Amino acid sequence: MMNRRAFLGAAGCGVAGVAALAGYAHLLEPFWLDVTRRRLPIRRLPQSLHGRTLLHVSDLHIGPLVDESYLDRVWRTGRELQPDLVAYTGDWVTWRGTAQLRQLETHLANAPRGRIATYATLGNHDYGERWRELQVAANVADRVTQSGIRMLRNESVDLDGMLVAGIDDLWSRHAQPRKALAAWRAGTPALVLNHNPDCLDDRAAWGGYDGYVLSGHTHGGQCRSPFLAPPILPVLNKRYTSGEIDVGDGRRVYISRGVGFNLQVRVNVRPEITLFTLHPA
């Protein structure tokens, strides 16, 4: 039988353990940036893009919740990678008011750019607090564009023979995959930027597109046990957690765990930026 002293000792250890885990989850892991390195397969990739690097950054959530010095460190890390291309897949800000536009302008001055090109899309938080404020989205998009980054809102551009398309945000009800991919033809090398991976499940709207997609939005669930799926995911399709997923119709998606947060807690889901090396599929 456990005596009082042993019981109190065990209880004290338990409390200390819980406090340590809480401190780790709140103060350490949300800012413990991971640089993930992967290969990105593109069918019929133009020769000029073989071996080029692409930095994927998502879910910055610039605003009152994410520490400014942490974001500065993210920018510095991204610039040191010297990517050829950079893709930002939305949720630039956590909107609370016009102060976020000034913060965004400051951070855009330091955000990494690709030596060849830099592209971006919008996420739901870029549409304001209720994801329906069109003027907020226009202001965010304008600031990004004025900084020299090519904003893609249901449109595409040609990159040396490869189509790069960007789909607008799903929750704001402005996602139009068919419009974004209007210039795509079967067999054309392409890459799609799309904030919310749930958008992938409207297959008919994608017009037969069978290439690679970069997404964010989920933050990887932010908390998960080593062997179980995250208990909370902001998507309908719970397959869409993080990392590379085979959609099943030729499309593959990489879902970033994101940089920022709306709730300062992460467990077993470190924030990330991802450095891809392009190669032929």
Question: Language model features by range: what are they?
Answer:
Residues 36-39, 103-184:
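Extended active-site neighborhood of metal-dependent phosphoesterases/phosphodiesterases
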